[in-house]
């Protein structure tokens, strides 16, 4: 009887990938990056093991949103003090905190729990086209569609 090969921590080979967010839609980019972080693009994907690659996203400030989401979508956070609910529109987030906007979208698409937190640590988001990970020799990854 044959068994399905399962990946473990010692057999995983991770690559560093660079994704350019310029002109890409937030949700479409986020789903593909979440899939890369989970390792679902690899034939060795195993649900209970972090088989994903490291992903570097550049040009985060040039991300696009469709429809009226720039003005209508609201991001909420709480200061943990009474009456401390704060809100920002997507336009304010893209202008002031584009990295956070992408991170929140991608984090919501990863598993909730210790494995999802470990996957999220492999994500690096930067404004502009420069990043400090040249030593890892990242490959440019072209998104589908």
Swiss-Prot record:
The keyword Ribosomal protein applies. Keywords: Ribonucleoprotein, Ribosomal protein. GO terms for molecular function: mRNA binding; structural constituent of ribosome. Gene3D superfamilies: Ribosomal protein L13 (3.90.1180.10). Transmembrane segments: none annotated. This protein is one of the early assembly proteins of the 50S ribosomal subunit, although it is not seen to bind rRNA by itself. It is important during the early stages of 50S assembly. This is Large ribosomal subunit protein uL13. It comes from Bacillus pumilus (strain SAFR-032).
């Amino acid at each position: 009887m044959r068994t399905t090969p399962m990946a473990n921590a010692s057999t995983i080979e991770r690559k560093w990938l660079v994704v350019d967010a310029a002109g890409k839609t937030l949700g479409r980019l986020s789903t593909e990056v979440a899939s890369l972080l989970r390792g679902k693009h690899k034939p060795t994907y195993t649900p209970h093991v972090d088989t994903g690659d490291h992903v570097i996203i550049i040009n985060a400030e040039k991300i696009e949103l469709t429809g009226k989401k720039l003005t209508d979508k609201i991001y909420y956070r709480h200061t943990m003090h009474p009456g401390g609910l704060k809100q920002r529109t997507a336009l304010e987030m893209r202008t002031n905190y584009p990295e956070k906007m992408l991170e929140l979208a991608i984090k919501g698409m990863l598993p909730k729990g210790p494995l999802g937190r470990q996957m999220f640590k492999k994500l690096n988001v930067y404004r502009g086209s420069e990043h400090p990970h040249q030593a890892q020799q990242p490959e440019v990854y072209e998104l589908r569609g």
